């Protein structure tokens, strides 16, 4: 994830489905405040009816909501309405087992519709008709996110998911790397592993993220590095909104926060505000990528052609073999004076030579992509919620 200029880009952000969790919490409060005996009697009758429905191989229905099983009902995992490719979700919906948050559209591009190969959703305004036959016209205009499946076992809980963890990696050429449970204790998620007051809100966000993954079986991550419509400099504001779109300047020269306890600007602030919890137009909220989310994403995209322990064969590094860039812009890093030159348009194609360091606009080449996620290897360093201290 290296970038030779002095900036650091935002990590691809996480979309967590938390709206339904809030609604469930409200329902629980209502039940607690009502007649407990009457509620218990009604629950028994509902459970009996649901058991009969499940035994008959059908979807069960309780209080007007549908569930695939009684276990799903107990876990609050409501059956979501199905949605088609190219369709915009007016409520949290299901597409091939992935949750499509309210306000987002399933890609209408055939190579972006498979969960195992990177399902893509777009933030396309209501009433807009995208031209799916011209992919670049859509990729450069709307924010995009990719679904990262996470295995949830019956032994997991909403507070702890065995397959969702921060990890180290060992080399394995045939698989692209092996994920291990070992991890340096130098890195922590701020205020989530000690007794200090959580001044950033990240500990609570991680709690909600884990609950969401337990309920829905995954999360979304930005398809591209955070982008800017204009070149950034060391004097650029730390509160300017970013986008997650193709052919944008990397959102570099950005701090993690004002300090480790003040996130009123910088990467954490920007990520939180892309899809804030107060925005009821969406069935999702955003946050800066956590360490566990980053490693889960790596586990999803790795294969024999995309190593997560040596990205020189598919990433943008100075020592990467020569490869071709066929869209967007590039800026050459001048090693003689340690400066980044101005961005230049790619005309037809540009050969990135081994030994030359360059910075690319987002999604500049398919070579640097795995499962529809771009520029994970090289181009820029990425921020996560991890830190070396609290």
Task: Explain the meaning of each model-derived region.
Residues 28, 151-155, 224-228, 293, ...:
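Acidic glycine-/aspartate-rich tracts in secreted/extracellular proteins
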Residues 30-53:
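Aliphatic-rich helix starts adjacent to a transmembrane/signal segment
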Residues 381-382:
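Generic structural signal for well-ordered beta-strand positions
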Residues 154-163, 228-234:
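Short, solvent-exposed loop/turn elements at domain surfaces
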Residues 69-149, 153-158, 286:
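GGW-centered surface loops in extracellular recognition modules
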Residues 6-28:
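N-terminal single-pass transmembrane signal-anchor helix
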Residues 135-142, 173-376:
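Short aromatic-cysteine micro-motif
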Residues 51-68:
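Short extracytoplasmic
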